[in-house]
């Protein structure tokens, strides 16, 4: 089902991309947009994980430098019945994390330096389990495709500001000043709405499955509360420069959108915590626990 959802998303985003191209350049613009969209679809499927990791300056963690952290992730992956993902570190003080990759065999989990410093090992395990749930559900390709297309659509809409008011080679005037302004506002908004719909619907499921993987819903609940509070106060510069990837993080990393419920990329954190607390109250815990170091060498 993951590939089916991704295929539908690619079709929707491609149609939106073509529409923007047609409004900017008429028939020629639509043809160019179609070619660009086809290339983007290929690139996104095979290389979008590398692109997103590069956007955030993530570097792969050497198992010898953080053996306990690697052992924790490997143990959680085994409990989830999936391959060990590649592990990346993002050098920012804001605690956060995301997962990416086209399938469980080609996946990566990225955590921030701030996450490893601010959270307890149990809370880190809860966060990693949440990201593994996204990988297991094949949400990662879906979210990465959305981020890539949303960024491209926003960029294309900005081109309309410079080229949308004139005539194209066929003498057509696809959009005037009013149309250009509408395009600049509505195209990124439409892409953003797709992002929000996908992210909100998948976060609750990843919370539920992540809690089952780590065996302790309250570990993740505690982590979410702590990340939410710190993320409001600590900047994530690379995330602010790449807002199209905000929906990939476990908590929205953007300050501008953190208080906007209408355009939130994530469900309300208090509601997520309440759902996890309800799971714990219902006894949804595992008797066997993952190996969690008392004090990781990454701090």
Curated annotation (Swiss-Prot):
It is a multi-pass membrane protein. Its main location: membrane. The active site is at 131. GO terms for molecular function: metalloendopeptidase activity; zinc ion binding. It is found in: Cell inner membrane. Keywords: Cell inner membrane, Cell membrane, Hydrolase, Membrane, Metal-binding, Metalloprotease, Protease, Transmembrane, Transmembrane helix, Zinc. Zn(2+) binds at residues 130, 134, 203. It is an enzyme of class 3 (hydrolase). Its cofactor is Zn(2+). One of its GO terms (biological process) is proteolysis. Binds 1 zinc ion per subunit. The chain crosses the membrane at residues 7-24, 29-46, 145-165, 174-194. GO terms for cellular component: plasma membrane. The keyword Manganese does not apply. The keyword Cell membrane applies. Its EC number is 3.4.24.-. PANTHER family: PROTEASE HTPX (PTHR43221:SF1). HAMAP family: Pept_M48_protease_HtpX. Belongs to the peptidase M48B family. This is Protease HtpX homolog.
């Amino acid at each position: 089902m993951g590939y089916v959802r991704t295929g539908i998303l690619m079709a929707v985003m491609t149609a939106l991309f073509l529409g923007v191209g047609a409004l900017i350049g008429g028939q020629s613009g639509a043809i160019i947009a179609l070619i660009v969209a086809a290339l983007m679809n290929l690139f996104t499927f095979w290389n979008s994980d590398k692109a997103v990791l590069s956007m955030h300056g993530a570097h792969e963690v050497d198992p010898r430098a953080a053996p306990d952290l690697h052992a924790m992730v490997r143990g959680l992956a085994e409990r989830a019945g999936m391959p060990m993902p590649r592990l990346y570190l993002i050098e920012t003080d804001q605690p956060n994390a995301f997962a990416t990759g086209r399938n469980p065999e080609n996946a990566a989990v990225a955590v921030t330096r701030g996450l490893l410093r601010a959270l307890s090992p149990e809370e880190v395990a809860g966060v990693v389990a949440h990201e593994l749930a996204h990988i297991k559900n094949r949400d990662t390709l879906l979210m990465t495709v959305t981020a890539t297309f949303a960024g491209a659509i926003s960029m294309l809409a900005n081109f309309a500001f410079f080229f949308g008011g004139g005539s194209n080679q066929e003498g057509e005037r696809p959009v005037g000043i009013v149309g250009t302004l509408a395009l600049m506002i509505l195209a990124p908004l439409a892409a953003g709405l797709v992002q929000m719909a996908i992210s909100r619907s998948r976060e609750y499921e990843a919370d539920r499955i992540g809690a089952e993987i780590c065996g302790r819903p309250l570990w993740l609940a505690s982590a979410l509360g702590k990340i939410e509070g710190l993320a409001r106060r600590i900047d994530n510069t690379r995330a602010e420069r790449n807002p199209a990837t905000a929906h990939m993080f476990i908590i929205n990393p953007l300050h501008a959108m953190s208080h906007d419920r209408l355009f939130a990329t994530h469900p309300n954190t208090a509601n997520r915590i309440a759902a996890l607390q309800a799971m714990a109250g219902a006894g949804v815990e595992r008797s066997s626990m993952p190996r969690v170091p008392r004090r990781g060498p990454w701090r």
